[in-house]
Amino acid sequence: MEEEEHFVNIDLNDDNICSICKLETDTGTLSFCHVCFELSIEGISSATLLHSKSLRGHRDCFEKYHLIANQKLSRAKASHSTYEGVKRALSQRINRIIQYAQNRDSVTPENPGRWGAKQILCHTQQAGRKLVPQSDAQVPRYAPRWTEEASMVSESDYGKSMLDCHSAEELGLGLWPGERPQNREQRDSRQRRHSGHSREELMRKNVEELRQLNEQLLLQIQNVFEELSVVVQEKDSLSSELHVRHIAIEQLFKNCAKLPWLQIGRAGVKAANNPVE
């Protein structure tokens, strides 16, 4: 009777459905878990493996499942995170904003400050990298009566002249301490791209100039469409990644009996100190 408990009912009509993401796919694209197969060759007991030989699924789904389960997987075969580049770019943008919000007098060419140093890279168990902000960086302090000071400045002649400025060059900002000339050129090109023409300017132009403006406008529309397409593809990949993670987490809780290193108590989920590798 004890042996009968180990039998699993297999539906022979679900050959085209992935057992991890539960999505239907083309016939012949599913296979058994290659990660569990490699672990079994290395000597890992079959009782501790997450997937049996009867389960079929996508190769990427099995790899992501094992990454979440924190079992051993070679770095060469581990799929990189699809949104790793997005997180890195966002961290760099936030660092630039914080750098500009700080006291600009303390950041000079002679004393560039601590922001010129290399960013600290934190390595996770999944061989990923993320940027960690400097712990000893200066934090900008804001006066409690900043609204009153702003109103006083705006009433003065100097404040009015500053409000009349529309660009960074007119304000006298120039280049940021950590900004490259290439970034400035990209920002200026975006400003020129979004600058429109008035009706009077268009009336003074001839047909050839209007034709050139029309071609430039079509090129700008094409570039914007390509940028939007890239953003939509990134959004779809993030949605797929999130869906696979949710499914994997649910199955991890269902198969917690097969994971001896996972202890579930009243206080919550606690991982043991020595995970199975």
Curated annotation (Swiss-Prot):
Stretches assigned to coiled coil: 197-229
InterPro entries recorded: EURL_prot
Function, as annotated: Plays a role in cortical progenitor cell proliferation and differentiation. May promote dendritic spine development of post-migratory cortical projection neurons by modulating the beta-catenin signaling pathway.
KW Coiled coil (keyword) present: yes
Family: Belongs to the EURL family.
Keywords: Coiled coil, Differentiation, Neurogenesis
GO biological process: cerebral cortex neuron differentiation; positive regulation of dendritic spine development
Region feature (Disordered): 173-201
PANTHER family associated with the record: PROTEIN EURL HOMOLOG (PTHR15961:SF3)
UniProt keyword Coiled coil, yes or no: yes
A Pfam family: EURL
Species of the source: Danio rerio (Zebrafish)
Record lineage: Eukaryota, Metazoa, Chordata, Craniata, Vertebrata
Identification of the protein by name: Protein EURL homolog
